[in-house]
């Protein structure tokens, strides 16, 4: 007898070996129809299998449907194969290579004699729908490696043969067939093509075979697939919104920054963009000051001997920019932590000095591949709001609790209230005692519970030197951005010999907490631009108000108004632009509206005589005529409320 344990804990008994599909059918016809795959085993041993998978011993089983994350992966993987099937059907000379699942979709790489056109994509997608409607069964078979190589060579699929030839000769490989198309794949796949209904092909791009620029350039067709029509439409709508909000596009239109071919992966900030940067940095500087952090500044270039001690020279060197001077090797720092330990080590530290908090706007460089660069979101040169707390094990929990509370306040001020909390726990390979890990993990979890946060645990995803919390924010269109982190580190203080004198008079190693709230300022500003679609809140806006005259007769008055606004705010003044051009007022209003300014002030003869201005708020909202003092009061409230 075979005993199957279901997710609710109930058991079902079968007289002999049974397939996943048969188990689903025995539970109910609805589940049998919805079944896409099965998940057998538990924990690290759990795996997703085809519905044709035969269960021949007692084991746990859950039926995977389109409602499950695993089900969505199976749908996307199978849709990638459906894409390849359609391409081979329409373009028999095309050769197939690889087609994995990626975030929100899939791609498949093809070798073909000419580039695919937009019209080709339309035809391929139409053919995919036709093949799906035929509801052809997807059938798995297993071949010895050499036999599989011969099979694919025999049908002219040389790329597939090359992939299989790289597999050890004593291994079998699995193939999946749907209709006339058969592909190499580990699986699992949907039981039939009729399960694939909601998909769309997105674009074609170039990709080198095996990622090597010396190899042939292939055509990579990207697509997306979802469990329902609503999910697909929602995703496509989100993409439309994301395109409108693209920080690269808005950066050009709003004259904030540009990326230049003379320095790929680094940002040229224009005056307006640098104003935005300064607002973010000065805000975060106040956060440092108000929460017990001492701001420090370390050098950007450090000798390789330091990076050898930290382990970066061996494990991270290819991502570091290196240079040589007077027969010594140096590297531009990819992170700030070693420098902060060197500062900590200057002078004797006592337990009374702990927790000791350092903060730095540290400029770092990482040699990211050119293909991975993306506007100001993924760069080679970036500045972090990088902080490090040196403390005892007993101080971890209160420090993390205070940090989480602070992070929530900062994110709310920038317009983000939806935060996802993830605790990454100990991996198999790690340093430090189990007792220290127990204490550190409990401190992270207890701190989140004390702050009322719901969290998920990601087992084994911690670094080898300590557990961490990752803070991921959701933006206005539902995208997730992992920005904040707090990481416990038992290793680096040991590697760099950091010590403090304890209450017992002996020397002890401090625990090091790496923490960042916004992370890379460049990336965070890119997120802000997209979150607000370029229409920055008044307190952040590079230009907070523009004052416009109707005729030359009001030019001097406009200058007076601008001067008064600038003087009204003692720290740095309101950021005001004047527009005295001899253009129609409607033209000037429209031009400044396109720059997404919070306020446009218009002065004609009546306003000049009354010592007032006509105020338009963003979104073409007419607030009427008011005194300059009344407008100052209005803006002051906006800024105070971070509106």
From Swiss-Prot:
Transmembrane helix keyword on record: no
Subcellular location: Cytoplasm
CDD domains: TGS_ThrRS, ThrRS_anticodon, ThrRS_core
Signal peptide: none
Span list, region Catalytic: 246-537
EC number(s) from the headed UniProt entry: 6.1.1.3
Enzyme class: ligase
Subunit note: Homodimer.
PANTHER family per record: THREONINE--TRNA LIGASE, CHLOROPLASTIC_MITOCHONDRIAL 2, THREONINE-TRNA LIGASE
Protein name: Threonine--tRNA ligase
Organism from which the protein derives: Delftia acidovorans (strain DSM 14801 / SPH-1)
Taxonomic placement: Bacteria, Pseudomonadati, Pseudomonadota, Betaproteobacteria, Burkholderiales
Gene: thrS
């Amino acid at each position: 007898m075979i005993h199957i344990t279901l997710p609710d804990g109930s058991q079902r008994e079968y007289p002999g070996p049974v397939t996943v599909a048969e188990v689903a059918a025995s539970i109910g016809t609805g589940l049998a129809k919805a079944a896409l795959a099965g998940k057998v085993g538990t924990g690290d041993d759990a795996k997703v299998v085809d519905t044709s998978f035969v269960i021949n011993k007692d084991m746990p089983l859950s039926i995977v449907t389109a409602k499950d994350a695993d089900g969505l992966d199976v749908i996307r993987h199978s849709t990638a194969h459906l894409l390849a099937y359609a391409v081979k059907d329409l373009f028999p000379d095309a050769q197939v290579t690889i087609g994995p699942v990626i975030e929100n979709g899939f791609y498949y790489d093809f070798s073909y004699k000419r580039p695919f056109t937009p019209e080709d994509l339309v035809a391929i997608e139409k053919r995919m729908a036709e093949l799906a409607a035929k509801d052809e069964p997807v059938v798995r078979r297993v071949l010895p490696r050499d036999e599989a190589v011969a099979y694919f060579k025999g049908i002219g699929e040389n790329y597939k043969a090359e992939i299989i030839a790289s597999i050890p000769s004593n291994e079998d490989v699995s193939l999946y067939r749907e209709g006339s198309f058969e592909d190499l794949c580990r699986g699992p796949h949907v039981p039939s093509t009729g399960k694939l209904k909601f998909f769309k092909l997105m674009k074609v791009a170039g990709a080198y075979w095996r990622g090597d620029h010396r190899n042939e350039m292939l055509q990579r067709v990207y697509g997306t697939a979802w469990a329902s029509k609503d999910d697909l439409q929602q995703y496509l709508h989100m993409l439309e919104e994301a395109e409108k909000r693209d920080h690269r596009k808005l950066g050009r239109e709003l004259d904030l920054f540009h990326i230049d071919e003379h320095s790929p992966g680094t940002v040229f900030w224009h005056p307006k963009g640098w104003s935005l940067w300064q607002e973010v940095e000065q805000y975060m500087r106040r956060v440092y000051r108000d929460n017990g952090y001492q701001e420090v500044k370390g050098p950007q270039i450090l000798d390789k001997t330091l990076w050898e001690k930290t382990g970066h020279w061996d494990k991270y060197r290819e991502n570091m920019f290196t240079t040589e001077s007077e027969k010594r090797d140096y590297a531009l720092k990819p992170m700030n932590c070693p420098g902060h330990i060197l500062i900590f080590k200057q002078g004797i530290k006592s337990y009374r000095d702990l927790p000791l908090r350092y903060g730095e706007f540290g400029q770092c460089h990482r040699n990211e591949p050119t293909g991975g660069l993306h506007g100001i979101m993924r760069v080679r040169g970036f500045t972090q709001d990088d902080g490090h707390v040196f403390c005892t094990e007993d101080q971890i929990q209160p420090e993390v609790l205070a940090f989480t509370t602070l992070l929530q306040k900062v994110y709310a001020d920038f317009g983000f209230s939806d935060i996802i909390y993830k605790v990454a726990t100990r991996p198999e390979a790690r340093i430090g005692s189990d007792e220290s890990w127990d204490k550190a993990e409990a401190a992270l979890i207890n701190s989140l519970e004390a702050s009322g946060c719901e969290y998920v645990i990601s087992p084994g995803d911690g670094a080898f030197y300590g557990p961490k919390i990752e803070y991921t924010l959701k933006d206005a269109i539902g995208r997730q951005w992992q920005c904040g982190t707090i990481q416990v580190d038992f290793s680096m203080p040991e590697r760099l010999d950091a010590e403090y004198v304890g209450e017992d008079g002996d020397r002890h190693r401090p625990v090091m907490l790496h923490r960042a709230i916004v992370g890379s300022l460049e990336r965070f500003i890119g997120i802000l631009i997209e979150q607000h679609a370029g229409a920055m809140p008044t307190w952040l806006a590079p230009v907070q108000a523009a004052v416009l005259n109707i005729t030359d007769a009001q030019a001097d008055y406009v200058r007076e108004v601008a001067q008064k606004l600038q003087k009204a705010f003692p720290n740095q003044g309101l950021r005001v632009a004047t527009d005295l051009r001899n253009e129609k007022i409607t033209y000037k209003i429209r031009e400044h509206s396109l720059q997404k300014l919070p306020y446009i002030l218009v002065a004609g003869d009546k306003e000049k005589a009354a010592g007032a201005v006509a105020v338009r708020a963003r979104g073409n909202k007419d607030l009427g005529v008011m005194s300059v003092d009344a407008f100052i009061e209005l803006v002051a409230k906006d800024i105070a409320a971070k509106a």
